[in-house]
Each structure stands twice: as structure tokens, then as C-alpha cells.
Amino acid sequence: MERKISTPSLFLLIILVGFPQISETIYTPSLPDITNNLHASSNMVQLTLSIYFLGFAFGVFCWGRLSDSIGRRPAMLWGILVYGIGCLGCYLSDSVEWLLLSRFIQAFGASTGSVVTQTILRESIDGTKRHAVFAQISAALAFTPAIGPLIGGWVDQSLGFKAVFFTLVVISVAIFMYTFVSLPETRVSTPSNINTLSVAKRLVFDIRIWAFGFLIGATNGILFSYYAEAPFIFIEFFHMAPGVFGFFGVFVALSSILGAMLSKRLLTKFPAEKIILIGSMVTTLGAVCLTSFTLYGVNPSVISLSLMVAFIFTLLLGIGIAIPNCLSLALVHYSDVLGTAGAIFGLGYYVVVSLITSGMSYLHNGSLVTMPIYFLILAILMVLVSKKIIVNHKTK
């Protein structure tokens, strides 16, 4: 039964939870250009993606806590304002160090779109319908990481990488205005003295929280590590123009959309826990194929490109199947402290994302084999965690 809470439109929710992902990937076609123009190493420039998730992790904690104390709407608006300041800093950056700092601020603000929106969804919709809504949003959000490179590739090719960051400034203003006009307050009451340490203790001693934190962190880590590596694979190895690469990302995003649609359909036959295991196994299959293919040897031909895309498609398909169910199930036992629990949980899994993307940045050596092996290790761990903790715990 649904609680009688004012719920924003699905379109607004998709925008609010999606703009942080666009901000993460919009400049990925520009990574080679940024490397050259700021006279930095490719490893250093890739850290601008990892630092984004670190800022995101701390922001999730901050805005989640604030949303419990000052309300969902004010927390969202203040976060978007900070995000806009970070976008302006990125535009004005003339060194990689300044860019790293601005990316941290940008991510800190953008994180409100993730944690507060998820809190709104969890407190306003119950049960199987909540799983279905998360699947719908996940299907729509599969486009947002791809929309970023599509816009960024075209803008970079036409106007240069600086214009990409100016585009984000414009987006931040537009989102702030739309949110100010359209977002209602959804918190039904002011919580009395929520003890953060008490909530943290509940989370720390909950084995399922650790499992869901790893699974959400690993799936996002794989996804955004791919977006960090993809420009160097497709632009430098396969000699794609930035604009073509940006459009190419939309095709890859179809895997995540199809995965979310399959997840919604599978919910009529299987429990959500089982679907998480299925998604992890599909991701592992894609990682095995991709690793075997790159170990065999890849050349910059149409056939090699097609096979690589097919294997990446399979890998991301599994992520699309698993992740909406992880997000929906993670905090079902914390409805009394959703904002604070979401803040702490989000801090944890975004630290995992940051560590995984940092690992990819550290391991980057120009070889096509590195990324698939890295993904294979993570995918195998996902299967083990899904089977041993999520599914077995549900059975018991």
C-alpha cells in the first residue's frame, strides 16, 4: 500500500538523478584533448573521474543528512547550487590541479540528485511497485551516461573542450530553475534526534548492507571505468572522431536499457534477489568473452570493433539487470531513518566506486587487455557475493 506522500513527476525525478551521470561522462571524449592542452599525463587526467566519485561520496552523506533535518527540497536546491559553482570552476580551470578541485566541488553538489531522489522514491512507493519504478528509472538513466559523450563529443569537436564545461554551467542553471518551480517537499514529518552513530551501527552489523554496497559500487565502478577507458580505446586505437565516439556511446547504452527492461519483466517470475544473481552472471559472461578476445589479439578493423562492442554490450546488459534491484532492496529495513541511512550507505558505496575507478586509472597502460581482466575479477566477486549473501540470506 502506498503512503500518501506528494511525489514529483517521473520526468523530474529522472532529470534529478540523471544529471550527475551526464556531468560524469560529458567530457570523456575530451580526455585526450585535456591531456594535451593541460600538459598532463593520461593517468592524471583519468583521476578527474575518480575524484568525482570521491566528492560524490562525501556529498551523498552531507545531503542525505541535511534532507532529514531541513527537508528534501532545500537539500536538493542547495546541492544544485554547489554543483553549478563546481561547473563554473571546471570551465575556468587552466591546470589539471584546479580541474581536480573543481570536479570534487561539482560532484559534491551533484550528489544531492542521487541521494535525495532515491530517498523520495523509497519513502513514497512500497514493495514490488518500487522495484518496477526503480527499473523504469534505471532504463531511462541508461541513456544519461551515453547522452554525456554524445553532447560532449559534438561540442568538443565544434568548439573545444572548454565549451563542454560551459555547457554544464548552462545545464546547472536550467536544472535549478526547473527544480525550484516543480519540486514539492516530500518529507512528511521532522524526525526527532536521529542518532547518526546508532544508524551507522545498524548498517555496519548488517551483512546484506555490505553485500549491496559492494554490488552497487562494483556495477557503477565497472560502468564508469569503462567510460574512462573508452575514449582511449575507440578514439586512439580504433581512430574514431570525438563526435562519432559520442554517438557510438548511445548504442552501447542500449545494453543497460535492455537490462533494466528485462529486470522489470523477470520480476513477474523471480524474486529480486535471484535477478541480481542472474545479472551478475551475465556480466561475468561478457567479461570472460571480452578478456578472451583481447588476449587473442585485436586489430583496428571493423570485425574487431564489432566483436568488442558485442562483448561490452553483454557485460553492461548484466549490470542493467542487477542494479535496479540492488538499489530497491538495499534499505528496505531502514524506512524509519531513510535519509540518514541513505547518506551513510551512499557514502560507502561511492567510496567503493571511487576506489574501483582509481584502480582503473592506476592500471591504465595503453593495453587493451587491462580493462577486461580488471572487469572479470570484479564480475566474479559480484557472482560470489550475490550467491553467498544475497540469495542464500533470502532463502534462509
Show where each model-derived region lies:
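Paired small-residue
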Residues: 82, 86-89, 97-105, 306-311
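Extracytoplasmic
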Residues: 8-42, 226-231
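Helix-breaking motifs and short loop linkers at transmembrane-helix boundaries and internal kinks
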Residues: 37-39, 71, 92-98, 109, ...
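Juxtamembrane intracellular "pre-TM" segments in multi-pass secondary transporters
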Residues: 1-3, 184-212
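Helix-loop-helix hairpin linking two adjacent transmembrane segments in secondary transporters
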Residues: 98, 135-180, 247
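Conserved MFS/SLC helix-loop-helix module at the cytosolic interface between two early adjacent transmembrane helices
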Residues: 58-96
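Cytoplasmic helix-loop-helix junction between adjacent transmembrane helices
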Residues: 96, 102-143
